[in-house]
């Protein structure tokens, strides 16, 4: 299958309302085309293994991948349709990274038509231990993973670095790729991309512990994933 999303990158003069809604990347008339399939885009016995393989294939080290995945685990339990607990439909976070406010609106508007039906509270509950929702076919689960992971990577490449103490780079994704340890990758991705209310100590203790377990499980394995091309 083929997925077309329309990412936007930071540009001077973008609407003030985007800032207040946490939309930090915007580029008018830009488009990104991504393609993949459940057979060669992601592979594995559970969503954890599939996400690991995709992110490794996207160019992250094992340490960086573990850091991103620990944040995904804390946010959504690896479910691409997770809806934030305690929030009415349309409010709070949604998806692997729990995109919220204007960021949620942007990704929701780009969900491929064949997958739109899963953007529903019906599928927003807690996943099973494989990170999957039992009522979603594996093929569609994998398509959702590919779509959201492609979106996450592209957003990271277009998003300016806002977290302090990790150095400088042209965007969040490039800075992430400079980090050498699991702890640094975990804290940076939280502070720069997720931006939850957790303190830095809690991030290290809770998400950092999860990241280390992910690293120990998957280190030494590679991945397979689709790709994106951007035009403007």
Map each language-model feature to its residues:
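Solvent-exposed, polar/charged alpha-helical surfaces in well-ordered, non-transmembrane soluble domains
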Residues: 49-53, 57, 66-69, 150, ...
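Hydrophobic/aromatic-lined pockets within catalytic cores
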Residues: 56, 60, 73-77, 157, ...
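Short, functionally critical alpha-helical segments immediately adjacent to catalytic or ligand/cofactor-binding
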Residues: 62-79, 190
């Amino acid at each position: 299958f083929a997925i077309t999303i329309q990412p936007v990158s930071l540009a001077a003069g973008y609407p003030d309302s985007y800032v207040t809604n946490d939309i930090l990347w915007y580029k008018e008339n830009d488009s990104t085309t991504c393609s993949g399939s459940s057979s060669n885009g992601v592979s594995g016995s559970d969503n954890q293994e599939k996400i690991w393989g995709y992110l490794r294939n996207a160019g992250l080290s094992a340490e960086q991948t573990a850091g991103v995945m620990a944040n995904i685990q804390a946010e959504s339990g690896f479910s691409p349709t997770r809806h934030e607990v305690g929030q009415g439909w349309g409010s709070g976070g949604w998806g692997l990274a729990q995109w919220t406010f204007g960021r949620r609106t942007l990704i929701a508007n780009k969900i491929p038509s064949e997958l739109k039906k899963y953007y529903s509270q019906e599928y927003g509950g807690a996943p099973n231990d494989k990170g999957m929702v039992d009522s979603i076919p594996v093929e569609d689960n994998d398509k959702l993973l590919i779509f959201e992971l492609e979106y996450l990577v592209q957003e990271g490449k277009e998003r300016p670095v806002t977290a302090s103490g990790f150095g400088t780079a042209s965007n969040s994704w490039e800075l992430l790729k400079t980090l050498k340890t699991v702890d640094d990758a975990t804290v940076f991705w939280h502070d720069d991309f997720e931006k939850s209310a957790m303190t830095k100590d809690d991030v290290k203790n809770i998400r950092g512990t999860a990241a280390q377990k992910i690293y120990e499980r998957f280190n030494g394995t590679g991945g397979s994933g689709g790709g994106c091309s951007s035009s403007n």
